[in-house]
Amino acid sequence: MIQSGEYYGKDDYYSRTLTKEDFWYGHGLLSPLGEDIPNPYQDISTPLTHADYEQKRASMRKEFSPDSKKLAIDLTFSPPKSVSIAMLDPILKYQLIEAHNQAVKNVLTYVESNYIIWRKHTNKGNKTEHIKTQNALFACLQHRVSREQDPQLHTHCLLFRKTMVDGKIMTIEDRFIHSNQYLLSLMYDNELSKALQERRIPLRESNSLDQKNKHFEIDGINDTLIDHFSKRKIQIQQYQDTYGLSDSWEGSHAAGLASRKAKSTEKLQDLEKMWLQDISELGGFVVEKRPEKTNSTRLLEIDTIVKNSINLLQEKSFAFSKADLMIEVYKEGMMMGITLPEFEKSFDAHLQVDLIKAGFRTLNNEVYYTTPKNIARAKYIDTILLQERIENYATLSAENAIDKIDTISSELKANYGWELSKGQKEAVTKMLSTSDKYVAIEGIAGSGKTTMLEQAKNLYQEQGVKIIGMAFTGKAAEAMETEAAIPSQTIHRYLNQLSPSTPHDTWDFSAVKKADTPEVWIVDESSMLTDHLLSNILKASEQRNAKVVFLGDPNQLLPIGTGNAFARMTLEGAEQVPTVRMREINRQEEGSN
């Protein structure tokens, strides 16, 4: 359970000069959820007092079972460090708090409209439905100090895990909120950027330490001041490095939760005096407001960002959600500060031209979209894989291949005490004896794919066939080369070699010549291929006239099954290419996969 009392009063609540820093928010205020909260204007936002908060916390606990561990979900929003520093200027202080609160409320409105979901289960037909109730109650508690005693404005938005459904108080299905925290963080950043610029606060672009993520700071607050007051950020980064957490937003978020410690109880006024002294010693700061101006091309610029984001996503996957698109748009448009209404307007326009509904994914309760280009690409893949061919791509007859692989298996048994599994034998036989140009091998982890590839490579080389390995990741390519002795590299690197004069990911294979001797390409990690990458492998292999063996793990499919080419080509009962399924776990040699 979130001990909300621990979040309250840490910044010396009773010494604050502002009277409306903390507030209730949400349509729950206008329902039985908020009937015991003073709300004289019957609004979806009203001031929060300590007494009312404690009373609501106690009454809300009664709505949960005694063993319930979680009363509320904490959504915390914090501006860039320069905002917290600039707040020490009394002229800017109230405007910055106002901009922060505006951004917070806009995000909470989106959360309430989209992610307050009740799970309805119907025994008849055993069906589950996720219903958006659009009714939430947030307790928003504003703090000013980081855990390392640095200035850091932030608001804990405690979402009570109850909502109203048909006049009854029901429990929220909170996984939709947890899975969209990155989106909500980016949305807050954009809303804040826009709110600050509306108040003529000058912004400058700033990058993360790894130079991967764009961000912004207030112009006039230099990096020396920011670094001086960022002890908590440095602490989180050190925790990530020490424990090997990724340098992504998710890694930073996890490190922040794992490394946090209790705040001290020093008074805010005393801390502010100390901060001002530090600022003075470091040269101070001056924030000069910018003159008011209008941007006549703003909507066009936003539309371009949305279009570019669609293009980016269609190269990553066949289908993507609206939330996926929002993330890309918000990352690119942060300096502009793209608001939700502006995004929605552009999205609706593109929905008529560039986006096609691909289906609904129950797992995250979202509609998925694809593009005309992705539809055409998928059709091309299906056409190439399914077309009948005159040329025979077999290296050995089925009988000859079986004899050879049986002999190899017997020799392994005699020399090492183990033999090839049924799945391994079938895979090698199919690779060498089928007349088809494209073959798929589906193998789970531990099924002995590496051992199988090594034996196939030996038989191919005996027949004078050149075998080329490639994989989605460099690690897998290296493993294929060192463990199966197949010369290998990443797919991107190999395609770049075939089309050296074209930009990355925009290959042109029209000048590629047919191979002088038979070639077989082994494409490992095929279950991770996007349609974009697979279509280019097919184009290159058609020009080169190479046989292609797609090797994939059914347990490592891309997150979205729709449009996943490997899943489509190996669909049981409707295979597009000859497919062997290796499902036996083998313990033939150390490191076998």
At which residue positions do the language-model features occur?
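Conserved ATP-binding/catalytic motifs of P-loop helicase motor domains
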Residues: 1-593
